[in-house]
Amino acid sequence: MKTLLLTLVVVTIVCLDLGYTLKCNKLVPLFYKTCPAGKNLCYKMFMVAMPKVPVKRGCIDVCPKSSLLVKYVCCNTDRCN
């Protein structure tokens, strides 16, 4: 009986995928934040003139369009930014 109960709990957790959340780097990549519901992309923003220096990183729901001055790079896996 205990085995059956344990099996049901494990199957429920696997099927519902409880607790899956995306993790995105903050400005300093050593630190990250767990994204709230609905924000399913990580992003990195930097100035086009200085592409090696990110200005901002975090979670976002829709990837913004880049402009002549600012470029956005978006991705959807943990700590990919």
UniProtKB/Swiss-Prot annotation:
GO molecular function: toxin activity
Xref: PROSITE patterns: SNAKE_TOXIN (PS00272)
One GO cellular component term noted in the UniProt record for this chain: membrane
Disulphides: C24-C42, C35-C59, C63-C74, C75-C80
Signal peptide (UniProt feature, chain positions): 1-21
Claim: Disulfide bond is one of the keywords in the record: yes
GO terms of biological process kind: killing of cells of another organism
Keywords of this entry: Cardiotoxin, Cytolysis, Disulfide bond, Membrane, Secreted, Signal, Target cell membrane, Target membrane, Toxin
UniProt keyword DNA damage, yes or no: no
Tissue specificity remark: Expressed by the venom gland.
Pfam families cross-referenced by the UniProt entry: Toxin_cobra-type
Subcellular location, record wording: Secreted; Target cell membrane
Gene3D superfamilies on file: CD59 (2.10.60.10)
Assembly behavior: Monomer in solution; Homodimer and oligomer in the presence of negatively charged lipids forming a pore with a size ranging between 20 and 30 Angstroms.
Cited function: Shows cytolytic activity on many different cells by forming pore in lipid membranes. In vivo, increases heart rate or kills the animal by cardiac arrest. In addition, it binds to heparin with high affinity, interacts with Kv channel-interacting protein 1 (KCNIP1) in a calcium-independent manner, and binds to integrin alpha-V/beta-3 (ITGAV/ITGB3) with moderate affinity.
Protein family according to the UniProt entry: Belongs to the three-finger toxin family. Short-chain subfamily. Type IA cytotoxin sub-subfamily.
Name by which UniProt lists this protein: Cytotoxin 4a
Organism encoding this protein: Naja sputatrix (Malayan spitting cobra)
